[in-house]
Amino acid sequence: MNNRKLMDLHIFETDATAIDRTGADALIPVQESNEIIQGIIAQSAVLSRGRRLQNMTSRQYRMPVLDMLPIAYFVNGDTGQKKTTNQAWDKKVITAEEIAVIVPIPEAVLDDAEYDIWAEVRPRIQEAFGKKIDGAVLFGAEKPSSWRDDIVKTATAAGSVVTLGSDLYTSIMGEDGVIAKVEDSGYFVNGHMADISMRAKLRGLKDTTGQPIFRSDMQTGTNYTLDGAPMNFPNNGSFDKSKALMISGDFSQLVYSIRQDMTYKLFTEGVVQNTDGTIAYNLMQNDMVALRAVMRLGWEIPNPINALKADKSKRCPFAYLKAGV
């Protein structure tokens, strides 16, 4: 139960709140207006960059991962004997955990709004879910105890961390840079995630031939690449630059499975409780409705053995750049 509370957004840190008339005032028009200025809806960077497995049919998903490689031998001449070898698999388990939120709102506010308030709320719920998922997977923020260590902690244990020095190019592209750390584990970097502050550091960064290594798509101007690999700047508030400035790696090794896709349910009866157990809202008595959103998913880093790095304690498909002291 404690495990579930960590990811259950309707277990409020403070007393329960609702969308009141003041909060929805911009949606209740005084004069005619047919547009609502929306901010950019930030989706989960982890789910968009990671590899989705088949949906889970139960709370746990068991995944076989190669743990021992076979060895071949030369046969010495015509009379030499052929030797045997072995191959083994380990099992990694993805455990689905629930993320949820409840949004109460008075019926009078819904009646007086010219716009569909629920249509405006739902994208923000998706953004909140994305922030919660990204924070837990990348940095372990409020992660359930059944989930594995986050990417930054995993990379730290494997020694795949680089402290930013005076030369940013060397810290990223050098022989002991972030990209080299991933390659030393037998993986190729196919993506980067970074704090928004890294954009200013990367502008104008050039390779030894004078060519920029940080580029944007000339057609859209929004898709960025670093050394040819796509780069994300999560803007949902999940990226903790105090722990990492940039995370690079083979994101095909970040896998996730969904037990229950995001579902919405509208309630007209029931109660919403505060943290101390007292009743904050009685939906029927207060003429309110509540939208509940629920999603269940889990993730894992398979990290199978490869020929370049047999020691799994030192093998990691991710590395990160952290700020210098």
Question: Residues of each region from the PLM?
Answer:
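Protruding loop/beta-arch "assembly-hinge" segments enriched in small, turn-prone residues
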Residues: 2-27, 52, 71, 76, ...
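Assembly/oligomerization interface modules of large self-assembling protein complexes
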Residues: 14-101
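Generic recognition of stable, solvent-exposed alpha-helical segments in well-folded globular domains
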Residues: 28-32, 58, 116, 120-124, ...
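Short helix/loop capping segments that flank catalytic or ligand/cofactor-binding pockets
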Residues: 29, 65, 71-75, 112-113, ...
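Extended oligomerization regions of viral-like shell subunits
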Residues: 57, 153-289, 295, 325
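Short loop/turn segments at secondary-structure transitions that flank enzyme active sites
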Residues: 67-72, 100, 109, 131, ...
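Short conserved micro-motifs at the rims of enzyme active sites and ligand-binding pockets
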Residues: 74-76, 115-116, 203-207, 241-246, ...
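Alpha-helical scaffold segments that mediate packing/assembly in large oligomeric complexes
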Residues: 90-93, 98-184, 319-325
